[in-house]
Design a protein with these regions (language model features):
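Extreme N-terminal starter segment of soluble prokaryotic enzymes
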Residues: 1-3
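Short catalytic helix/loop segments, enriched in acidic residues and glycine
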Residues: 21-41
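Flexible, glycine/charged-enriched surface loops at secondary-structure junctions
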Residues: 49-56, 205-217
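Active-site glycine-rich loop that binds ribose-phosphate moieties when present
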Residues: 120-146, 155-158
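Active-site rim beta-loop-alpha module in soluble metabolic enzymes
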Residues: 145-149, 154-196
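Conserved small/polar residues in nucleotide/adenosyl-binding loops
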Residues: 226-227
Length: 228
């Protein structure tokens, strides 16, 4: 079984403020370590469930957040930005059996998480076919274009709910819950265990149950905070 994991940092355990995800801030290092731990938890669980080849795409910022020295032997880690239009999904193709997401977050325009955004912090909101477009939505349509099922997501409670609306049979693991500008965070160990259990559950049974159907047309609307 060959799996693709796209990882972000804002939805990982403990992250509550944007500056905690910036490399030039003292707080960043510990959260990058936690991002690495959650990715490793997903990889180990997937391997135990039968995955013999796993590709992980570091999808945050300059894409050099995950510690490559912590990756298991059966994992290929994609670091840095190639300029490929798939961005957080760069490396995905038709050969994969499933896609998983670690550390994902609510989209721009959704008040469910203090640092909700889509791609950058410049957009007030982005709508696709009338719905606020999350990175999960965009990346899942990328997976759908290759007919690769979307199996698992970890992140804040808002993006977990939105993921289930789009893919009813997806397995999710909630890492935190937002309330206004505050964030109710689960303990890192609890999050890692819920990822392990969730990944194993996601890989049980027929993976095609989590296939995403591409719309016939796309209507895209973006509103930024400032004039371009």
């Amino acid at each position: 079984m060959k799996l693709f994991i796209s990882a972000d940092i804002e939805g990982c355990a403990g992250v509550a403020l944007a500056y905690e995800t910036h490399k030039n801030e003292a707080a960043y290092g510990e959260f990058a370590k936690q991002m690495t731990k959650e990715v490793v938890a997903a990889c180990e669980a997937a391997h135990e469930a039968g995955a013999d080849e796993i590709v992980v795409k570091d999808g945050h910022g300059d894409a050099t957040n995950i510690d490559p020295l912590c990756m298991p032997d059966y994992v290929t880690l994609i670091r840095g930005k190639s300029g490929h239009p798939y961005n957080m999904m760069s490396g995905l193709d038709d050969s994969f059996d499933g896609v998983m997401y670690i550390g994902y977050h609510a989209p721009a325009g959704n008040p469910g998480f203090a640092i909700s955004h889509t791609s950058t912090g410049n957009s007030l909101y982005i709508r696709l076919n009338g719905s606020c477009m999350s990175e999960f939505m965009l990346n899942s349509y990328t997976a759908a274009s290759h007919k690769v099922p979307v199996l698992f997501l970890s992140g804040d409670s808002t993006i977990c709910g939105l993921a289930r609306e789009m893919v009813p049979d997806i397995t999710t693991a909630v890492t935190k819950t937002g309330l206004g500008a505050s964030t109710y965070c689960k303990a890192p160990g609890q999050v890692e265990e819920s990822i392990r259990q969730g990944v194993k559950k996601a890989l049980a049974g027929n993976l095609s149950r989590c296939s995403v159907e591409l719309p016939e047309t796309f209507t895209y609307e973006a509103v930024s905070y400032t004039h371009l």
